[in-house]
Amino acid sequence: MRVKYVFTKKSFDKIVEDHLVNRCYLPYNKVIYKKSFSESVTLLTNFGIITGIMYTKNGKLNREDGPAIQYFNKQGTVYGEKYFLNGEELDEFQVIVLNSKNENTISKN
C-alpha cells in the first residue's frame, strides 16, 4: 500500500518533529508542500523518507487537488481517501455538503 500525504506547513512541521524527535515511521511517499518549508523537505529527503515533491495552490488542498490522503493498491488504483478541515477528519456527508457549497479549503493541517 502506498499513501500520498498532502500537508500544510503546520502539519508538515509536526511530521518533521515527530520523525526527528520521536523517530516515528514514515512510509515512502509524495509530499505536497509550500516552498516556505523546503529546508524541512530537504532534511527528510536526505533521510530517504521523501521520494517525490510537488506543489499545491496556496499550499492548501482543494477539490481540484484531490483528498488529503489517498490509499493506492499495487496497481496504482485509489481504494480509499480521507478529507480534513481545520485538523478534523470529515465524514462522507460533510465532504458532499462542502462540495455542494463550492468550498475549496479542505485540507490536512
Feature-to-residue mapping (PLM):
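Glycine/tyrosine- and acidic-biased, solvent-exposed loop/turn segments at the edges of beta-strands
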Residues: 3-6, 14, 18-109
